[in-house]
Curated annotation (Swiss-Prot):
Biological role: Major transport protein for glucocorticoids and progestins in the blood of almost all vertebrate species.
Phylogenetic lineage: Eukaryota, Metazoa, Chordata, Craniata, Vertebrata
GO CC terms of this entry: extracellular space
Main location: secreted
Binding residue positions for cortisol: 247, 279, 385
Name of this chain's protein: Corticosteroid-binding globulin
Site (Conserved cysteine within steroid binding domain): 243
InterPro entries reported for this sequence: Serpin_CS, Serpin_dom, Serpin_fam, Serpin_sf, Serpin_sf_1, Serpin_sf_2
Pfam families attached to this UniProt entry: Serpin
Domain notes: Proteolytic cleavage leads to an important conformation change. This reduces the affinity for steroids.
Source organism: Mus musculus (Mouse)
Length: 397
């Protein structure tokens, strides 16, 4: 199965929802030439993780993972074959153009949107006296702003503390913990991390947030802070796929699809997720007057990508089939890649609570939609159509 590294970036090349953004001459650069042969990489990966954790919260950032994998192609002697296996047509695009595209994309995502608080990056930790070649270090720094830090200690506890402290500093304290009980035979540990929090275009008022029941399953109920909003909100009820949803925009380029499967239909809805489904939903959204209840929560997850990428067709990086001879000076390179994602969903209001006015009056005759059972949260950047976050929320408490 041919998989594309670049997740959802070029969905705007299709009709409807994906063609809302104008393209300037400056923007028509190499990052737009990253059009994948299979833009369903994000959903393939998400579905695999959900299958492995069907009764648990699942959270990943496909675009962040994509950048990490593209960066690692710089380390392999057979990089052309590696990139072709990931879905790139190397007869139409050079390796340099691919990396230049990711370089520009990274700049767009991290600098052009004031409505998203996002910290995203890659950092390589070198163990067991591993020394990387200057050319590889220069390329990863230039294209991906990646750092390489040496861990001199063979004490795994101290090594884990160094990794955690570095990521905590890079995310301004948002991500405090990445690894625990670190015991790895790897000589290079790549940490791919992202923190995301958005400001809603139509914010919730903290004055209206209240404690409500959330039904985790048939036997388990938890109390969660439930945000409340009343107004015209983009809504769609799917007659073909058993779910209903709202689309809510962040200030700036961010947008979200918050999907509520019918009772017991989570697996059916997850199986139906793909580019065409999201495109169809976007076209069919209509404003509806409603009382909307969504849990306020903070979620984080950590994955060893070796465990999941092999299941979606990418495994050679973690085996002796990858030739890293052009990357290291002496010590053989063995690789571990960890993905850490954190999502914060709150009222998203830039104003102090005291200035938000009195609690909203919820009209009794309005339609009420409560996300009080497991749901799906998808966040995209509308300008690049990058898949920022994908989450299955089984228990927001």
């Amino acid at each position: 199965m041919s998989l594309a590294l670049y997740t959802c970036l070029f969905w705007l090349c299709t009709s409807g929802l994906w063609t809302t953004q104008a393209v300037t001459d400056e923007d028509s650069s190499s990052h737009r030439d990253l059009a994948p042969t299979n833009v369903d990489f994000a959903f393939n990966l998400y579905k695999r993780l959900v299958a492995l954790n069907s009764d648990k919260n699942t959270l990943i950032s496909p675009v962040s993972i994509s950048m990490a994998l593209a960066m690692l192609s710089l380390s392999t002697r057979g990089s052309t074959q590696y990139l072709e296996n990931l879905g790139f047509n190397m007869s139409k695009m050079s390796e340099a153009e691919i990396h230049q595209g990711f370089q520009y994309l990274n700049s767009l995502l991290q600098q052009s949107d004031t409505g998203l608080e996002m910290n995203m990056g890659n950092v390589m930790f070198l163990l067991q006296n591993l020394k990387l070649k200057d050319s590889f270090l220069a390329d990863t720094k230039h294209y991906y702003e990646s750092e390489a830090l040496t861990i001199p200690s063979k004490d795994w506890t101290k090594a884990g503390e160094q990794i955690n402290n570095h990521v905590k500093n890079k995310t301004q304290g948002k991500i405090e913990h990445v690894v625990s009980d670190l015991d790895s035979s790897a000589t290079l540990i790549l940490i791919n991390y992202i923190f995301l929090k958005g400001i809603w275009k139509l914010p919730f008022s903290p004055e209206n947030t209240r404690e409500e029941d959330f039904y985790v399953n048939e036997t388990s109920t938890v109390k969660v802070p439930m945000m409340v909003q009343s107004g015209n909100i983009s809504y769609f009820r799917d007659s073909a796929i058993p779910c209903q949803m709202v689309q809510m925009n962040y200030v700036g380029n961010g947008t979200t699809f918050i999907i509520l499967p019918d009772q017991g239909q989570m697996d059916t809805v997850v199986a139906a997720l793909n580019r065409d489904t999201i495109d169809r939903w976007g076209k069919l959204m209509i404003p509806r007057q409603m009382n909307l209840y969504i849990p306020k929560f903070s979620m984080s997850d950590t994955y060893d990508l070796q465990d999941v990428l092999a299941d979606v067709g990418i495994k050679d990086l973690f085996t002796n089939q990858s030739d890293f001879a052009d990357t290291t000076k002496d010590t053989p390179l063995t690789l571990t890649v960890l993905h850490k994602a954190m999502l914060q969903l709150d009222e998203g209001n830039v104003l102090p609570a005291a200035t938000n006015g009195p609690p909203v009056h919820l009209p009794s005759e309005s339609f009420t939609l409560k996300y009080n059972r497991p749901f799906i949260f998808l966040a995209f950047d509308k300008y690049t159509w990058s898949s920022l976050m994908m989450s299955q929320v089984m228990n927001p408490a």
